Curated annotation (Swiss-Prot):
Belongs to the imidazoleglycerol-phosphate dehydratase family. InterPro entries: IGPD_sf, ImidazoleglycerolP_deHydtase, ImidazoleglycerP_deHydtase_CS, Ribosomal_Su5_D2-typ_SF. This is Imidazoleglycerol-phosphate dehydratase. It comes from Saccharolobus islandicus (strain M.16.27) (Sulfolobus islandicus). Its EC number is 4.2.1.19. Keywords: Amino-acid biosynthesis, Cytoplasm, Histidine biosynthesis, Lyase. One of its GO terms (molecular function) is imidazoleglycerol-phosphate dehydratase activity. One of its GO terms (cellular component) is cytoplasm. The keyword Cell membrane does not apply.
Amino acid sequence: MARNANVTRETKETKIEVFLDIDRKGEIKVSTPVPFFNHMLITLLTYMNSTATVSATDKLPYDDHHIIEDVAITLGLAIKEALGDKRGIKRFSHQIIPMDEALVLVSLDISNRGMAFVNLNLKRSEIGGLATENIPHFFQSFAYNSGVTLHISQLSGYNTHHIIEASFKALGLALYEATRIVDNEIRSTKGVI
């Protein structure tokens, strides 16, 4: 069974289109109006070993908040759809990733109980067109819509770029590992995820 999804989400504020194939490493195309966010999305999808296209149009381009939130929602929905009933997935994963002085831990459970606990000390208020206050919000919106319980904790570091990038790398690697097929069972005592 192919594990991919095409999801479009359009509001009065944005139009987001996501194609995601979690089993085929291939081309990644990302286009949003926020340069640093493009870099982080490419990083996330690369470390997920996926094929993906993310296109985001901001209909009210006065702030980056709506783009960040709506991409997170749509990407989360795409992962949830691609996983289907989650039969056979490993389900859990954690990664501790360094980027120079920064060290970030990501631990997740594809539980269908989407929530995020984010502990990042981001000293810069903006980087490459992205308000850093939207980074935790991205992770929260993504987790809620993907059905992933997500913990992200900064263990060390002071460079905002490094901390954020280590977070996206760790999330990508953890998602890759947790979505791997390891058997034909639903990994839950309930028999359903």
